[in-house]
Amino acid sequence: MTERFDLVIIGSGAGGGTVAHTLSETSARILIIERGGFIPQEAENWSPQAVWGEQRYRASERWLNAQGKEFHPYTHYCVGGNSKFWGSVLYRL
């Protein structure tokens, strides 16, 4: 790649997308790097059962918690990030 950018944003979710939108109003050359691709346009996208019940787009990887126990995080790698699946809603803890 021979192109040069002023800024690189990692991820296009809520944070990265907001930063990219704000910076798009400047003269900066911006590159967004996303781990996943676009979610396919298909009927299953509109089915809560397919998306949530069958976890159609959920990543298959496993993580380890602080005790070293394996768990399957509810995460997605796609353009728009997890925000696409959470409807841009973030709950306070």
What are these regions (language model features)?
Residues 1-93:
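N-terminal glycine-rich phosphate/pyrophosphate-binding loop and immediately adjacent elements
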